[in-house]
A protein has these predicted regions:
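Conserved, single-site charged/polar hotspot
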Residues: 2-432
Length: 432
């Protein structure tokens, strides 16, 4: 049995049930085919036969001295190991969890429990629990790590997805774009189960995993997008895919290897819808002195900058070179100095200089005048006013679905077509 299925089993909120009926007959599960995009009935495989919705553990905060909770109805604190009740709080009562010498304190009262669970007194109640002023669904698990408190939100997968797509996309976005984001976010969550296992949870609430905003990120349109795609995930070879997404591709998405990962058969460079928004095109000028300083902090002391080498970006050429990928993104830039030459990979340069993306060309700039990159070499002359202008398209790593591209496609395509455009040869399967 695949490892990801075992991880799902370990995070189920309810007893795991088979989709086989009492007679042992398999039900049909709707699947979108990778080429036709049509919905087809298929017999379930081991990857599709689990009906309960799994839960996911979101690590909201680590290294905390205290955590403050409040609920609009009665809620309780239990020992996470024994389920023994430790505290019962009335509606609107505040619970402050602190620590002392590796021990939890509940409103100043020490308890022996090593794991705390904060949950509604009535499990059927739909009241939110507030953590540090923000409302969340599900319940909370608190653990002590390295003498500090880690706060974990245990939530059903689709409640988690609702808190993700509302934070990743605007509530006023087209419904088909929101649905595509819901399936991508749900798939990424399943793929990422156990990503932060050493810290006691599955995923973090920021861009390292997916931005998660809890109930504050929800809206009617977001909830509708999640419910209308309930349980749907993208699969390749019977496993959830690494469904990466980004803000804007700048015309062409990137293959997974272009962002420093291993090549993946379902994450290829594809043509994207131009959006002609501020997210699409950007320019950033960096002085020669700042480039030298940034390279030196990364261990490359090139001395005074003499030349920068990069093949000019040709729109529509789709030509791979030694320093560019087929999408036009930068594989490597060569910086020639008085002391040495440094070849910096595109993703590393993006991080060093704070660039929005790696699909860019370069220009020489002095004052307000700029000179284009005609032959792949930009010469510098040791003058303090010299700048290197990065002229770029797209924001983010460029891999997988472009959110603004999905926004544009939603005017003519449904969410399945959007997903099949960005993720090659995948199946969209309803898991629960």
């Amino acid at each position: 049995m695949a490892g990801w299925i075992l991880r799902i089993l370990g995070t189920m909120l309810f007893t795991m049930l088979s989709l086989l009926d009492a007679s042992g007959t398999a039900h049909a599960v709707p699947v979108t085919g990778p080429t036709t995009g049509k919905t087809l009935p298929v017999t379930e495989t081991a990857a599709t036969k689990f009906s309960p919705e799994p839960a996911i553990r979101v690590g909201l905060a680590t290294g905390q001295e205290a955590a403050v909770f409040l609920a609009k109805g009665e809620y309780v604190v239990r020992d996470g190991a024994t389920e023994l009740g430790l505290e019962k709080l009335s509606a609107n009562a505040t619970l402050t969890v602190t620590k002392r010498g590796g021990q939890f304190l509940l409103n100043g009262k020490p308890v022996s429990a090593k794991i705390l669970v904060v949950k509604r007194a009535d499990s059927r109640a739909s009241i939110p629990i507030f953590y540090n002023g923000e409302a969340y669904r599900g319940d909370f698990r608190l653990i002590m790590q390295n003498g500090a408190i880690t706060v974990i939100n245990n939530v059903t997968l689709d409640d988690y997805v609702s808190g993700v797509i509302g934070a990743e996309m605007g509530a006023d976005w087209p419904m088909e774009a929101l649905r595509a984001q819901a399936v991508a976010a749900r798939t990424f969550a399943l793929y990422s189960l156990g990503r932060h296992e050493k810290e006691g949870f599955d995923v973090c609430p920021n861009t390292h995993c997916q931005v998660y905003g809890g109930i504050a990120a929800e809206s009617k349109t977001v909830l509708a997008a999640v419910s209308s795609t309930r349980g749907e995930v993208m699969m390749y070879n019977d496993k959830p895919i690494y469904s990466a997404f980004h803000a804007s591709s700048g015309g062409w998405t990137a293959g997974n290897e272009e962002a420093g990962g291993a090549p993946l058969p379902y994450l290829k460079s594809v043509r994207d819808e131009p959006t002609y928004r501020t997210e699409y095109h950007w320019q950033i000028a960096v002085s020669a002195a700042e480039i030298r300083a940034k390279l030196r902090t990364a261990g490359f002391d090139i001395g005074t900058l003499k030349r920068v080498e990069l093949t000019p970006l040709e729109e529509g050429a789709r030509k791979e070179t030694a320093d560019r990928y087929v999408s036009g993104r930068v594989r490597m830039v060569r910086f020639v100095g008085t002391l040495r030459t440094a070849e910096i990979l595109g993703p590393k340069l993006r991080w060093l200089l704070g660039l929005p993306g790696t699909r860019f060309d370069i220009r020489y700039q002095k004052g307000t005048a700029t000179t284009p990159n005609r032959n792949g070499k930009i010469e510098f002359h040791g003058q303090s006013s010299e700048m290197l202008l990065f002229d770029g398209w797209g924001r983010g790593h460029g891999v997988g679905m472009s959110q603004w591209g999905a926004h544009a496609m939603a005017a003519k395509k449904d969410y399945r077509a959007i997903l099949h455009h960005y993720y090659t040869n995948v199946e969209i399967i309803k898991l629960y």
